């Protein structure tokens, strides 16, 4: 997990004095974490030569949209929403119950953000520009104990939404209207694992891939599931785990490609009291 971070740190020290103890070192290398602040459950995409990221905002209304040229240095460019128009938020009675584990996607010329709150269900919004304006939040489904949604649009035009159940999984996939404003069925369970959550859906060639964390925040690992059918059955491989480092529970993040064909993984590490800081792995 942290071999690359360690190597970049040593490379930075060998070439010039370390600028900071984290992030961009000013000489073409970086040291994890790249964001030494509370950005839990990051999801990121590339659009053209720019990268965009969102993260959970448990108790600070707005959900930040971040932009980067290099996956290391990030700038705040907008707030995805200003308020959740439900009574408990108006009365300051929903601490830590805001937006959990959002998904960010670019489809049909628009940026799409989906998220759940633990007791209010599924919300979504869109914008044609990452700087906004963002459409008012649409409350897709009022339901308890959903988490970690991710939309996916297949080549045949069918849209889907993957999600899990608060605290323990499993992974469930629904058919969804193409505009993202309605779920079309009750969903099908496609995978059950230990605290399976954080679903991110991709398709490469003829295979559907689900990238999920398992095992819980403190001691978990990252799993990739693969199938030729979005409903499975899925084959499974653990692709990232703690190993012998102090970087506990590599957890819940996003796979993103670069214009020249490299692949990188952004994930969080719980590091209290700071919160959940963001790491970047090749």
Where are the regions a protein language model picked out?
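Carbohydrate-active catalytic/glycan-binding domains of CAZyme proteins
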Residues: 14-282
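Bacterial Sec-dependent N-terminal signal peptides
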Residues: 1-16
